[in-house]
From Swiss-Prot:
Name this protein carries in UniProt: FMN-dependent NADH:quinone oxidoreductase 4
Taxonomic lineage of the native organism: Bacteria, Bacillati, Bacillota, Bacilli, Bacillales
Record text on cofactor binding: Binds 1 FMN per subunit.
HAMAP family: Azoreductase_type1
Catalytic reaction equation(s): 2 a quinone + NADH + H(+) = 2 a 1,4-benzosemiquinone + NAD(+); N,N-dimethyl-1,4-phenylenediamine + anthranilate + 2 NAD(+) = 2-(4-dimethylaminophenyl)diazenylbenzoate + 2 NADH + 2 H(+)
Species this protein is from: Bacillus anthracis
Length: 208
Protein backbone atom coordinates (compact mmCIF):
# COMPACT_ATOMS: atom_id res chain seq x y z
CA UNK A 1 0.00 0.00 0.00
CA UNK A 2 1.33 3.42 -0.97
CA UNK A 3 2.21 5.70 1.94
CA UNK A 4 1.79 9.43 1.39
CA UNK A 5 3.02 12.09 3.79
CA UNK A 6 1.42 15.55 3.61
CA UNK A 7 3.55 18.19 5.32
CA UNK A 8 1.70 21.42 6.09
CA UNK A 9 3.67 24.55 7.02
CA UNK A 10 1.05 27.24 7.56
CA UNK A 11 -1.29 27.51 10.55
CA UNK A 12 -3.42 30.32 9.20
CA UNK A 13 -7.03 29.43 8.28
CA UNK A 14 -7.82 28.76 4.64
CA UNK A 15 -9.87 31.93 4.27
CA UNK A 16 -6.73 33.91 5.11
CA UNK A 17 -4.07 31.84 3.37
CA UNK A 18 -3.97 30.82 -0.28
CA UNK A 19 -1.29 28.23 0.41
CA UNK A 20 -3.68 26.49 2.80
CA UNK A 21 -6.44 26.55 0.17
CA UNK A 22 -3.94 25.02 -2.23
CA UNK A 23 -2.89 22.35 0.27
CA UNK A 24 -6.49 21.43 1.06
CA UNK A 25 -7.48 21.27 -2.61
CA UNK A 26 -4.57 18.97 -3.43
CA UNK A 27 -5.26 16.78 -0.40
CA UNK A 28 -8.96 16.38 -1.20
CA UNK A 29 -8.31 15.57 -4.85
CA UNK A 30 -5.55 13.14 -3.98
CA UNK A 31 -7.71 11.22 -1.53
CA UNK A 32 -10.54 11.02 -4.05
CA UNK A 33 -8.25 9.73 -6.79
CA UNK A 34 -6.25 7.35 -4.57
CA UNK A 35 -8.74 5.93 -2.03
CA UNK A 36 -6.56 2.95 -1.14
CA UNK A 37 -3.43 4.91 -0.26
CA UNK A 38 -2.41 5.53 3.34
CA UNK A 39 -2.39 9.30 3.86
CA UNK A 40 -0.70 10.87 6.88
CA UNK A 41 -0.92 14.60 7.58
CA UNK A 42 1.88 16.32 9.46
CA UNK A 43 0.93 19.83 10.59
CA UNK A 44 4.28 21.30 11.57
CA UNK A 45 2.72 24.04 13.69
CA UNK A 46 1.15 21.38 15.91
CA UNK A 47 4.48 19.69 16.51
CA UNK A 48 7.24 20.68 18.92
CA UNK A 49 10.25 21.19 16.70
CA UNK A 50 13.29 22.51 18.57
CA UNK A 51 15.89 24.28 16.49
CA UNK A 52 18.93 22.27 15.51
CA UNK A 53 21.71 23.00 18.01
CA UNK A 54 24.74 21.53 19.66
CA UNK A 55 23.00 18.47 21.15
CA UNK A 56 21.33 17.45 17.89
CA UNK A 57 24.40 18.15 15.77
CA UNK A 58 26.78 16.30 18.07
CA UNK A 59 24.25 13.58 18.79
CA UNK A 60 23.47 12.72 15.18
CA UNK A 61 27.18 12.69 14.34
CA UNK A 62 28.03 10.44 17.29
CA UNK A 63 25.05 8.16 16.61
CA UNK A 64 26.23 7.70 13.04
CA UNK A 65 29.66 6.67 14.32
CA UNK A 66 28.27 4.36 16.99
CA UNK A 67 29.51 6.50 19.88
CA UNK A 68 27.74 6.87 23.21
CA UNK A 69 25.40 9.85 23.55
CA UNK A 70 24.69 12.07 26.51
CA UNK A 71 21.12 12.14 27.79
CA UNK A 72 20.46 15.49 26.12
CA UNK A 73 21.99 14.34 22.85
CA UNK A 74 19.87 11.19 22.89
CA UNK A 75 16.70 13.25 23.39
CA UNK A 76 17.59 15.56 20.51
CA UNK A 77 18.42 12.68 18.17
CA UNK A 78 15.14 10.94 19.04
CA UNK A 79 13.22 14.03 17.93
CA UNK A 80 15.05 14.27 14.62
CA UNK A 81 14.81 10.51 14.01
CA UNK A 82 11.04 10.54 14.50
CA UNK A 83 10.51 12.90 11.58
CA UNK A 84 13.36 11.57 9.45
CA UNK A 85 12.09 7.99 9.64
CA UNK A 86 8.55 9.07 8.84
CA UNK A 87 9.83 10.91 5.77
CA UNK A 88 11.96 7.97 4.63
CA UNK A 89 9.09 5.49 5.03
CA UNK A 90 6.77 7.52 2.78
CA UNK A 91 6.55 6.66 -0.91
CA UNK A 92 5.34 10.16 -1.71
CA UNK A 93 5.72 13.44 0.17
CA UNK A 94 3.67 16.60 -0.39
CA UNK A 95 4.85 19.94 1.01
CA UNK A 96 2.36 22.80 1.38
CA UNK A 97 3.93 26.14 2.33
CA UNK A 98 3.76 29.89 1.70
CA UNK A 99 6.45 32.33 0.72
CA UNK A 100 7.00 34.53 3.76
CA UNK A 101 9.62 37.27 3.68
CA UNK A 102 11.12 35.76 0.52
CA UNK A 103 11.61 32.32 2.09
CA UNK A 104 9.85 29.49 3.94
CA UNK A 105 8.37 29.49 7.46
CA UNK A 106 11.01 28.75 10.11
CA UNK A 107 9.16 25.61 11.19
CA UNK A 108 9.58 24.09 7.72
CA UNK A 109 13.26 24.98 7.64
CA UNK A 110 13.72 23.24 10.99
CA UNK A 111 11.86 20.17 9.71
CA UNK A 112 14.08 19.97 6.63
CA UNK A 113 17.12 20.35 8.90
CA UNK A 114 16.01 17.13 10.61
CA UNK A 115 15.93 15.35 7.25
CA UNK A 116 19.42 16.43 6.26
CA UNK A 117 21.36 13.40 7.50
CA UNK A 118 24.45 11.82 5.95
CA UNK A 119 23.88 8.11 5.42
CA UNK A 120 20.11 8.55 5.36
CA UNK A 121 19.07 11.15 2.78
CA UNK A 122 22.49 11.58 1.16
CA UNK A 123 25.99 10.16 1.35
CA UNK A 124 29.46 11.54 0.85
CA UNK A 125 31.59 10.22 -2.02
CA UNK A 126 34.98 11.28 -3.43
CA UNK A 127 33.06 13.01 -6.22
CA UNK A 128 30.81 14.87 -3.81
CA UNK A 129 27.51 14.22 -2.01
CA UNK A 130 25.00 11.83 -3.60
CA UNK A 131 21.29 11.80 -2.75
CA UNK A 132 19.61 8.63 -1.53
CA UNK A 133 15.86 9.20 -1.99
CA UNK A 134 15.66 9.05 -5.77
CA UNK A 135 12.59 6.80 -5.91
CA UNK A 136 10.46 9.06 -3.71
CA UNK A 137 7.85 11.27 -5.40
CA UNK A 138 7.74 14.86 -4.17
CA UNK A 139 5.11 17.58 -4.65
CA UNK A 140 5.69 21.22 -3.75
CA UNK A 141 2.63 23.41 -3.22
CA UNK A 142 3.39 27.10 -2.78
CA UNK A 143 1.50 30.39 -2.79
CA UNK A 144 2.95 33.87 -2.96
CA UNK A 145 1.14 37.17 -3.35
CA UNK A 146 3.64 38.66 -5.76
CA UNK A 147 5.11 37.36 -9.00
CA UNK A 148 8.42 35.58 -8.49
CA UNK A 149 8.49 33.22 -11.46
CA UNK A 150 9.85 35.96 -13.71
CA UNK A 151 10.93 39.57 -13.62
CA UNK A 152 13.05 41.36 -11.00
CA UNK A 153 11.74 39.32 -8.05
CA UNK A 154 12.70 35.96 -9.55
CA UNK A 155 16.25 36.02 -8.23
CA UNK A 156 15.16 36.63 -4.63
CA UNK A 157 12.58 33.82 -4.43
CA UNK A 158 13.96 31.49 -1.76
CA UNK A 159 10.96 29.34 -0.85
CA UNK A 160 10.31 26.93 -3.73
CA UNK A 161 13.96 27.21 -4.75
CA UNK A 162 15.11 26.15 -1.30
CA UNK A 163 12.76 23.21 -0.81
CA UNK A 164 13.32 21.98 -4.38
CA UNK A 165 17.09 22.33 -3.94
CA UNK A 166 17.05 20.34 -0.72
CA UNK A 167 14.90 17.58 -2.19
CA UNK A 168 17.21 17.51 -5.21
CA UNK A 169 20.21 17.32 -2.87
CA UNK A 170 18.54 14.31 -1.25
CA UNK A 171 18.30 12.72 -4.70
CA UNK A 172 14.66 13.32 -5.63
CA UNK A 173 14.22 13.21 -9.40
CA UNK A 174 10.42 13.05 -9.59
CA UNK A 175 9.08 16.41 -8.41
CA UNK A 176 5.84 18.20 -9.18
CA UNK A 177 5.36 21.88 -8.38
CA UNK A 178 2.13 23.88 -8.19
CA UNK A 179 2.46 27.61 -7.49
CA UNK A 180 -0.23 30.24 -7.11
CA UNK A 181 1.26 33.71 -7.43
CA UNK A 182 0.35 37.33 -8.07
CA UNK A 183 -3.03 37.42 -6.35
CA UNK A 184 -1.94 40.31 -4.12
CA UNK A 185 -0.02 42.07 -6.86
CA UNK A 186 -3.05 41.95 -9.16
CA UNK A 187 -6.08 42.13 -6.82
CA UNK A 188 -8.51 42.61 -9.71
CA UNK A 189 -7.46 39.19 -11.02
CA UNK A 190 -7.05 37.49 -7.64
CA UNK A 191 -10.12 35.26 -7.85
CA UNK A 192 -9.20 34.14 -11.36
CA UNK A 193 -5.58 33.45 -10.37
CA UNK A 194 -6.52 31.45 -7.28
CA UNK A 195 -9.23 29.45 -9.04
CA UNK A 196 -6.86 28.48 -11.84
CA UNK A 197 -4.23 27.41 -9.32
CA UNK A 198 -6.63 25.26 -7.36
CA UNK A 199 -7.79 23.59 -10.57
CA UNK A 200 -4.18 22.88 -11.50
CA UNK A 201 -3.59 21.40 -8.05
CA UNK A 202 -6.52 19.02 -8.49
CA UNK A 203 -5.17 17.85 -11.86
CA UNK A 204 -1.69 17.25 -10.51
CA UNK A 205 -3.05 15.46 -7.43
CA UNK A 206 -5.08 13.07 -9.56
CA UNK A 207 -1.96 11.90 -11.40
CA UNK A 208 0.53 12.15 -8.53
Amino acid sequence: MTKVLFVKANNRPAEQAVSVKLYEAFLASYKEAHPNDTVVELDLYKEELPYVGVDMINGTFKAGKGFDLTEEEAKAVAVADKYLNQFLEADKVVFGFPLWNLTIPAVLHTYIDYLNRAGKTFKYTPEGPVGLIGDKKIALLNARGGVYSEGPAAEVEMAVKYVASMMGFFGATNMETVVIEGHNQFPDKAEEIITAGLEEAAKVANKF
